[in-house]
From Swiss-Prot:
Similarity annotation: Belongs to the HPrK/P family.
Active site residues of this protein: H138, K159, D177, R243
Comment field (misc): Both phosphorylation and phosphorolysis are carried out by the same active site and suggest a common mechanism for both reactions.
Coiled coil: none
Self-association and partners: Homohexamer.
Reported function: Catalyzes the ATP- as well as the pyrophosphate-dependent phosphorylation of a specific serine residue in HPr, a phosphocarrier protein of the phosphoenolpyruvate-dependent sugar phosphotransferase system (PTS). HprK/P also catalyzes the pyrophosphate-producing, inorganic phosphate-dependent dephosphorylation (phosphorolysis) of seryl-phosphorylated HPr (P-Ser-HPr).
Positions of region (Important for the catalytic mechanism of dephosphorylation): 264-269
InterPro entries per UniProt: HPr(Ser)_kin/Pase, Hpr_kin/Pase_C, Hpr_kin/Pase_Hpr_N, P-loop_NTPase, Ser_kin/Pase_Hpr-like_N_sf
Annotated protein name in UniProt: HPr kinase/phosphorylase
GO function term, MF aspect, one: ATP binding
EC number(s) stated in the UniProt entry for this protein: 2.7.11.-, 2.7.4.-
Length: 308
């Protein structure tokens, strides 16, 4: 759960806040209740009292048109409705009755010189990331040819060795072992590394490797958007892999389907080359190029011509 104080501290560089009233409510929670980030903050709206209310010049002018009795009535309804905080944009100064009511109801009242529209945009982006659904996945997250690739598989299959080979070929490491994913938008999943494991890769027999120190600054990435999952499996006689799958394999991640390829681990197989090929093929599919579909059309055309 996010508090008002955390919001103020996290945005101190971009949004300088001045705390005016409601100092005792610094730990007041900003409840999302499954709402989108766009619904959590906006211009003054009495119909939606549970969101962060922003006063710009127009809102304050509208508020000031009412007499004290009506202002008190409307603000009481708003403050009782569970508003997390009231923000005054454009460097505006609040009327004394608004300060008194925020102190009375212990609701944070803050001001900032940032323009109202810009303030709302910045906070929506921040809240969208901060309150996004998250999960932690065991695997190695890489930047391969500009695509976010999650390498998964049971322990001992060589995920870290494969990552090391990809790094040596010029690709980048995002996270090893524990990858934190957040769904920051309806069709966008972003992955990053926990601070404790930043730049580290654990390889059996070698221990922990500081990839940034060994390979340089360009060998690591802060975050990437997940586009492909490469799942490693042991090659056994019992396994029967479909050589030409007609349907793309996907895996659900935070309620969103993500493309998935399965690679068998066997002696003599160059997995790094296979991963690169899988990424290139995924890029083609994202551009609307379906190699298998084109082959099947070509095959159907050949059969049709041979039957004449």
């Amino acid at each position: 759960m996010l508090t008002v104080q955390e919001l103020v501290d996290d945005n101190a560089d971009n949004i300088p806040f001045n705390w005016i009233a409601g100092h005792g409510a610094a730990e007041r929670n900003i409840r999302d209740d499954g709402m989108a980030a766009a619904d959590l903050v906006g211009h003054l709206n009495l119909i939606h009292p549970s969101r962060i209310q922003v006063f710009g010049q127009e809102e304050l002018a509208y508020y000031s048109r009412f007499d004290l009795r009506r202002r008190t009535h409307h603000m009481d309804e708003l403050l009782i409705g569970g508003v997390p905080a009231i923000l005054l944009a454009d460097g505006l100064s609040p009327p004394q009755d608004l300060i008194d009511q925020c102190d009375q109801h212990q609701v944070p009242l803050l001001s900032t010189p940032v323009a109202a529209a810009q303030l709302i945009d910045l906070l929506r982006i921040y809240l969208g990331k901060k309150l996004a659904p998250t999960t932690t996945v065991h695997g190695v997250f890489m930047d391969v040819l500009g695509l976010g690739v999650l390498i998964t598989g049971e322990s001992g299959l060589g995920k870290s060795e494969l990552a090391l080979e990809l790094i040596s070929r010029g690709h980048g490491l995002v996270a090893d072992d524990a990858v934190e994913f957040s769904r920051i938008a309806p069709g966008m999943i972003e992955g990053h590394c926990p601070p404790l494991l930043q730049n580290m890769l654990e390889v059996r027999g070698l221990g922990l490797l500081d990839i940034r120190t060994i390979f340089g600054e360009t060998s690591v990435r802060r975050k990437m958007r997940l586009k492909l999952i490469v799942h490693l499996v042991r090659a056994t006689a019992q396994d029967k892999f479909e050589r030409l799958p007609l349907q793309d394999i996907t895996q659900d991640m935070l309620g969103m389907p993500v493309r998935k390829v399965m690679l068998q681990v066997a002696a003599g197989r160059n997995l790094a080359v296979l991963v690169e090929a899988a990424v290139r093929n995924t890029i083609l599919k994202l551009r609307g190029i379906d190699t298998l579909g084109e082959f099947m059309e070509r095959q159907a055309m050949a059969i049709l011509q041979s039957s004449k």
